[in-house]
Amino acid sequence: MARIAGVDLPREKRIEVALQYIYGIGKTTAQAICHRANVDVTTRTKDLTDDEVRRIRETIEQAVKVEGDLRREISLNIKRLMDLGCYRGLRHRKGLPVRGQRTHTNARTRKGPKKGLVRKAAAPAPK
């Protein structure tokens, strides 16, 4: 089993698909990595030679930010927006949609479950 960027790639899948198991690599990036490493995209992971795995690993290290580094960069970008106090940062801080979606209805995923309506206790009856 090939291990690239700290991820065990599935043995039976084509390398183009297996690379997509790495956070930060999608279909287009996987194809580009295979092309730059001179590896056929239809090759199964189990059929890769050690040299091909090494070339893929080096290509990823040079060209793409993946896994922990990418997650760290994204979280730092969000933290920077929140520290600036800009509109996008405020939306992140409040847990609301950031990209202009409506919130009067919908946006349940971002806002979380509904908060129930809290009613005041009935006043005691006059004597």
UniProtKB/Swiss-Prot annotation:
Transmembrane segments: none annotated. InterPro entries: Rbsml_uS13_C, Ribosomal_uS13, Ribosomal_uS13-like_H2TH, Ribosomal_uS13_bac-type, Ribosomal_uS13_CS. This is Small ribosomal subunit protein uS13. The keyword tRNA-binding applies. GO terms for molecular function: rRNA binding; structural constituent of ribosome; tRNA binding. Residues 95-118 have a biased composition (Basic residues). One of its GO terms (biological process) is translation. Residues 95-127 are annotated as: Disordered. Located at the top of the head of the 30S subunit, it contacts several helices of the 16S rRNA. In the 70S ribosome it contacts the 23S rRNA (bridge B1a) and protein L5 of the 50S subunit (bridge B1b), connecting the 2 subunits; these bridges are implicated in subunit movement. Contacts the tRNAs in the A and P-sites. Gene3D superfamilies: 1.10.8.50, 30s ribosomal protein s13, domain 2. Part of the 30S ribosomal subunit. Forms a loose heterodimer with protein S19. Forms two bridges to the 50S subunit in the 70S ribosome. Belongs to the universal ribosomal protein uS13 family. Keywords: Ribonucleoprotein, Ribosomal protein, RNA-binding, rRNA-binding, tRNA-binding. Pfam families: Ribosomal_S13 (PF00416). The gene is rpsM. It comes from Anaeromyxobacter sp. (strain Fw109-5). GO terms for cellular component: cytosol; small ribosomal subunit. SUPFAM superfamilies: S13-like H2TH domain (SSF46946).
